Swiss-Prot record:
UniProt lineage: Bacteria, Bacillati, Bacillota, Bacilli, Lactobacillales
Domain Glutamine amidotransferase type-1: 12-205
GO annotations of cellular component type: cytosol
Gene from which this protein is expressed: guaA
Name by which UniProt lists this protein: GMP synthase [glutamine-hydrolyzing]
Organism of this sequence: Streptococcus equi subsp. equi (strain 4047)
Pathway linked to the protein: Purine metabolism; GMP biosynthesis; GMP from XMP (L-Gln route): step 1/1
Amino acid sequence: MTEISMLNDIQKIIVLDYGSQYNQLIARRIREFGVFSELKSHHITAQELRDINPIGIVLSGGPNSVYATDAFGIDPEIFELGIPILGICYGMQLITHTLGGKVVPAGQAGHREYGQSSLRLRSASALFAGTPDEQLVLMSHGDAVTEIPEGFHLVGDSNDCPYAAMENTKKRLYGIQFHPEVRHSVYGNDILKNFAISICGGRGDWSMDNFIDMQIAKIRETVGDRKVLLGLSGGVDSSVVGVLLQKAIGDQLTCIFVDHGLLRKNEGDQVMEMLGGRFGLNIIRVDASKRFLDLLAGVEDPEKKRKIIGNEFVYVFDDEASKLKGVDFLAQGTLYTDIIESGTETAQTIKSHHNVGGLPEDMQFELIEPLNTLFKDEVRALGTALGMPDEVVWRQPFPGPGLAIRVMGEITAEKLETVRESDAILREEIAKAGLERDVWQYFTVNTGVRSVGVMGDGRTYDYTIAIRAITSIDGMTADFAQLPWEVLKKISVRIVNEVDHVNRIVYDITSKPPATVEWE
């Protein structure tokens, strides 16, 4: 069987994007059940879906009202394909509105719901098989279904939602007003699994090995016999992309490792030894530290920093590519979380991402982003499946802009050194305590704040370093890590004693949301 025919044989469930910031969680949950799933635009037509030939379709949640003049719609022929369709929140309202039911502002009907609610099942349904008749679900809707379309029947309700679940088994259409993809819906995973396996007929045989086969085939088809340039940042994402690309196209890949002066301690040498030595990647190391730091001098705004770094990265690549022949593609380690935070057609921008929002319009390369449907933990699983060792796969995430976004305000050599040295101490102590796998991400930040201190018999007026340590599954949400006090004490004592120009340590105890993982 050829790679392309093997790809066509992989079962797929398509999630249509209607604007929820957590849409990819639906696809992610379905992939956990061994069924491949990915997002597509809500503009997709019935014919395009026929060509994809999915075993199921999910209509996601979203912030709009289905009755608004600018509401995101759907090709009505999609409902005639005979493919099982699950509408979630806005998706259920869209099914209702399109097929002749009634949706009204919940304030008018008194059915507005935000937060956990108790769902009561009123009739048996394959969608809810194996779940209790009463269960906690997460509701988040400002509109409500007050009349379901002809051919549908009520499956479940709640105190404030008369139609919390409905179905038309003849047409294989299902609607739920709550969000099964989030953890607050206690049996949400069971519901999505029932849809993917029992209703859609998923075999549950998709794995990261399948993803590797799919991406290799896609890369080879896209690239042909042309050449690809990859920017290595020293982080997990670009390292995994490098190994994947080498597996796909071999010596057609050239890696550019830009030392922009914003790397962690000893990072440059480690990258060369790890990826060039162990994995045999062809890496050109470029010392562009003065070039970057000169451009960043006096810049305080975090968005401007990101744009400058993103632009300059590409210009450096352009300079290096001009020395090579026939380079047409630029590969990046963009993850789905980066795309979400940078905003999409249906989702608002939280902050621009260096792999998404910092690229100049006159860029001379086509982009290849093999990881842009994956979350961080899936990237680690991909690295393991590619045979990469734990010290690479479990390396701490590191943003493309590097320490520039871990120095608040203007970047100076002195500030950079405080972060570089304090971060090294933090990583050493976390490793000594055996907490590397328990803490999802950890790093230090120069807050830009100076405070008065006493060292020896003298007064000091030096920087405050913040420690950021979080626990998370996929980076979409996170909690601050509850590090043992004795570990925090060791870290604090070492930093103030070993790092010049630092006299105070604080611990960031903010979750995401409301904060993001990085400070800038």
